[in-house]
């Protein structure tokens, strides 16, 4: 499971793009 974080965004292991609050 890899999580990628960049400039207030986050992509979870399902590939969903989310905003970090």
UniProtKB/Swiss-Prot annotation:
Q: Which UniProt keywords apply?
A: Cell outer membrane, Disulfide bond, Ion transport, Membrane, Porin, Transmembrane, Transmembrane beta strand, Transport
Might you report a single GO cellular component term? Answer: cell outer membrane
Q: Which domain of life is it from?
A: Bacteria
- Quick check: keyword Transmembrane in the entry? yes
Annotated signal peptide: none
Question: How does the record classify its membrane topology?
Answer: Multi-pass membrane protein
* Gene Ontology MF terms in the entry: porin activity
Main localization of the protein described in the UniProt heading: membrane
Q: Where in the cell is it found?
A: Cell outer membrane
Any GO BP: monoatomic ion transport
Summarize subunit and interaction data from the UniProt record for this chain: Disulfide bond interactions within and between MOMP molecules and other components form high molecular-weight oligomers.
What does the UniProt record say this protein does? Structural rigidity of the outer membrane of elementary bodies and porin forming, permitting diffusion of solutes through the intracellular reticulate body membrane. Binds carcinoembryonic antigen (CEA).
Name this polypeptide is given: Outer membrane protein P2
Species in which this protein is naturally found: Glaesserella parasuis (Haemophilus parasuis)
């Amino acid at each position: 499971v890899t999580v990628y974080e960049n400039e207030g965004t986050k992509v979870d292991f399902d590939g969903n793009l989310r905003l970090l609050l």
